[in-house]
Regions:
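Non-catalytic structural scaffold of enzyme domains
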Residues: 1-21, 76, 227-235, 245, ...
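A charged, amphipathic alpha-helical module
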Residues: 1-47
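Flexible, glycine/charged-enriched surface loops at secondary-structure junctions
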Residues: 28-31, 84-91, 230-235
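Gly/Ser/Thr-rich loops at beta-strand to alpha-helix junctions
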Residues: 37-44, 94-96, 213-214, 238
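Short acidic, glycine/serine/threonine-rich loops at helix termini
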Residues: 44-49, 99-103
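A short, gly/pro- and small-residue-rich
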Residues: 46-63
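C-terminal catalytic subdomain
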Residues: 59-179
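Extended hydrophobic packing segments that form well-structured cores
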Residues: 133-255
Length: 255
């Protein structure tokens, strides 16, 4: 990392969080998935940012805002990916002209995604009511094949949503984005890819991986015995909607 701040005390605070969380997880049972919430940071001066980024780089799964499903899924996918190119992600905004999605999070994007050397920076965070947190800032990698994966609770079953994506480089510098990020294009295309994600109930938290394949995730879901929804280059939205409807009937009759 490079140091982009003189506020060393803020960085040291994050180092304390990283050491403490890692030690707690190892001593209390070897946990490999963690969550936090910006509204429940009792005793902490900052939202863990740099700390969580480093822990993800070591293979921990992380779920923001208490998202335990993503933490668990991330831990499994980190293992599958040998701790490379995998981590928490969130849809931030769409570029309707280029048909791309900018993915990021308030702090905790894994440096496994870094295409540029991550820089430690300190900026205000207008949520949570805590002190300015340290975080790593970088531009994300490009990769022709990647997946964005969401796990949702359907009430009577879990659904694993797997979407093929292409990671692309930033079209230009983003000096006002003080976090790490990724950009991607949806399969089969922007319009149908976004529609399919919404129809399937895809959440805004995902685990993105440039290492784990869509087929591996489909196989994993089948091994777990849960519903798997795949969105790829062959997806046709009208047929996709029918498939979701029939799957709902089938899964309800499996109980």
């Amino acid at each position: 990392y490079t140091m982009g701040t003189k506020r060393i005390d803020v960085v040291r605070e994050q180092a304390k969080y990283e050491i403490a969380i890692d030690r707690f997880c190892k001593e209390k049972g070897g946990y490999i998935g963690i969550v936090d919430h910006f509204g429940a940071l009792h005793g902490l001066n900052q939202l863990p940012g740099l700390a969580i980024q480093d822990l993800q780089s070591k293979g921990y799964g992380f779920g923001a805002e208490g998202d335990w499903k993503i933490a668990a899924l991330g831990a499994v996918m980190q293992y599958m990916a040998d701790q490379k190119g995998t981590g928490l992600m969130e849809d931030y905004t769409y570029d309707l002209v280029d048909g791309t999605c900018l993915g990021a999070h308030m702090l905790e994007v894994s440096p496994q995604f870094a295409a540029t050397k991550p820089e430690i920076q300190v900026h205000p965070l207008g949520i949570g009511g805590k002190s300015d947190p340290a975080r790593l800032v970088f531009e994300g990698i490009a990769a022709p094949e990647a997946v964005a994966v969401s796990m949702i609770d359907m009430g009577d079953r879990m659904r694993l949503i797997v979407q093929k994506i292409e990671l692309v480089k930033y079209p230009h510098k983003m000096p006002n984005l003080p976090v790490g990020g990724l950009m991607w294009k949806y399969k089969p295309n922007f319009k149908e890819g976004v529609a399919a994600w919404i129809y399937a109930g895809g959440a805004h938290h995902t685990v993105v991986s440039s290492v784990v394949t869509a087929q591996q995730m489909v196989d994993l879901g089948n091994m777990w015995g849960i519903e798997v929804v795949l969105i790829d280059e062959n997806t046709k939205i009208e047929q996709f909607k029918k498939d979701l409807m029939w799957a709902d009937v089938v899964w309800k009759n499996k109980r």
